[in-house]
Amino acid sequence: AALDGCLQAWGERRSLADLSPEEWQTLERLQRDFGGELEDLGDRVVGLERQIAQLEAQEFSPTLVMGGESIIALSAGFAGNDNSGDATNPVFTHLSRLGFVSSLTGRDRLRLEFQASNFANRGFASPSGFNSDMALLSFQGNTDNQIQLSRLEYRVALSDRFVITARPVGFSLSSVLTANSPYFDAGRGAISRFAEASPAFKLGRLDAGGGFDWLISDTVRLQGAYGVRNANRSQEGQGLFNSDHSAFGVQLFLKPAPTVLTGISYLNAYSGNGRLDTFTGSFLADTNSFMNEPARIQGVNATLQWRVVDNVTFSTWGTWLFSDAIDSDRSATTTSYLFGLSYADPFQREGDLVALLVGQPLRVVSGTGLPFGEDEDTSLHIELFYRLRLSDRISITPGVFVVTNPEHNADNPALVVGTIRTTFRF
């Protein structure tokens, strides 16, 4: 207090010559008594200034977060269009993923994901099996147990309501456009590729792209995405803006009520060989009846989720795709739809989920000048699964799906695929 008072009095003086002998003696005594403390205080101030300068130069300290998932499944197929008898053999497979997430500024996210899997030869969908994409599982993949980079993504928030995404590896339209499906999760959702989400979001077998997500209000969201195949190659028909397979999508995503989510999407794509490449329907549908020439594809997709009561959710989606050949008058119209009903926490078991999914895989319903015509009949996909929660990190999902008239052909007997999927998350 004495030192503070003295310094204040000193600051009020314009000249040291104005100090009286008594004041000089007081200053000398304070200097002797507090000299050590003043020197220590000076060192501390220097240290604080150094730390402040470091914080100003590095405003955010990046933190790396690691997470992973391993899906182990025992699966088997029965009946169907089995050309060799191999489809009935049970298979024991895995899909393992390891991801890393970090932020460089606090308003962005850098994500890398590595994957290894061993589901060989397209599984039950192979020519030696059911010979149909309708038999594909949602967690199916094959890297021959080699670790591969499956996802590289960078997202940055330009404002509190506007985010842009760039994904040079592992892109699909659903990387930006919300699929609005409660079953779009390979480890915890639907067991089939068809039932997990609408084919519209899988159009083109893309591998690189980006987009934006704009939260216009608390109930309205606008999303846009653009992607291509072979974006890393500079040859003709490849690259980011000259690829022979590209797709653009825009979606208006709405929340009209606290328990309702709905989305309406418009799609515009180019295919150098006329294929849709969604791998969710018949060969005729996915190849546009083997159109085999450049085509412009336009589509409309609608989705809905409605939480009827606390534990019951109804969901649905419908897709219409219109393909027109560029060099001829060939055209094709394909459709697909699905209805889902799920019940959460059955038998008072928190975290469990039982779901029933019924829909039509992608089908050619009309066309002009198509080499192999339209799909004559209609397949129906019926799926039932029960996700059993063992802990926060482990779940077991027994499930089965049946496809009537596989490949939309009434001459083919129904195919059945069953699985017991165990998912570990860490």
Predicted regions and their residues:
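Transmembrane beta-strands of outer-membrane beta-barrel proteins
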Residues: 67-71, 113-115, 167-169, 223-227, ...
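N-terminal periplasmic/intermembrane-space "pro-region" immediately following the signal or transit peptide
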Residues: 1-85
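Repeated loop/turn-to-beta-strand initiation elements of outer-membrane beta-barrel proteins
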Residues: 106-110, 161-164, 218-224, 258-264, ...
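Outer membrane beta-barrel transmembrane domains
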Residues: 265-294, 301-305, 315-410
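Outer membrane beta-barrel
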Residues: 85-231, 253-257, 338-366
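Outer-membrane beta-barrel "beta-signal"
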Residues: 341, 414-426
